[in-house]
Amino acid sequence: MTALDSSRLLQPRTASVHRRTGETDVQIHLNLDGSGRHEIDTGIPFLDHMLAQLSTHGLIDLQIKAIGDLHIDDHHTNEDVGITLGQALAQALQDRRGIHRFGHFWAPLDEALVQVVLDFSGRPHLSYGLELPTERIGRYETQLVREFYQAVVNHAQLTLHIRQAAGLNAHHIVEASFKAFARALRMAVERDPRRQEGIPSSKGVL
């Protein structure tokens, strides 16, 4: 390994993305090699709570500020935060050189149990298996959970499978999914010391 390669391995993987549309204005800064520090304000309290889980359990430093047309509903802001987060993940990983690529985790929360398996494959695909018993958690529409994950998947270009093994409380189920996603994400983006700067694909590209 060259000195340049060694230097690259030591550099924190960060990204800053600003997405502005006629509906929302979203700014995200993240550090994949962080400690779980976060400042999050999307205007959607439940989404803020879930993103805090992602940061804390994924050890991703995360700053998110979103302003959206919440007077209409939460849909545009929820989706655009997912889009911007996916873009930030893709930017931080660049060509995905030297990472483990795959991640998986089971997360319990009381009666809920959720599994997440993911692959930074470059091929966006979501297999979503959460069965949420209520239409809302507080004011947050539970159908927006899938929309958030789909937005992340499309723009981070990853394959994501979410499976619910148990759960009765919608809040517990969704939170377990975010915790499992965080830990699977942490596993997948970890640098692989054996691979060093190699691309984790037999094709040589992701």
From Swiss-Prot:
Keywords: Amino-acid biosynthesis, Cytoplasm, Histidine biosynthesis, Lyase
UniProt-listed GO biological process terms: L-histidine biosynthetic process
One Gene Ontology term, aspect cellular component: cytoplasm
SUPFAM superfamilies per UniProt: Ribosomal protein S5 domain 2-like
EC number: 4.2.1.19
Chain residue ranges for the region called Disordered: 1-21
Subcellular location: Cytoplasm
Pfam annotation, one family: IGPD
HAMAP family xrefs: HisB
Similarity section: Belongs to the imidazoleglycerol-phosphate dehydratase family.
Protein name as it appears in the record: Imidazoleglycerol-phosphate dehydratase
Protein's organism: Synechococcus sp. (strain JA-2-3B'a(2-13)) (Cyanobacteria bacterium Yellowstone B-Prime)
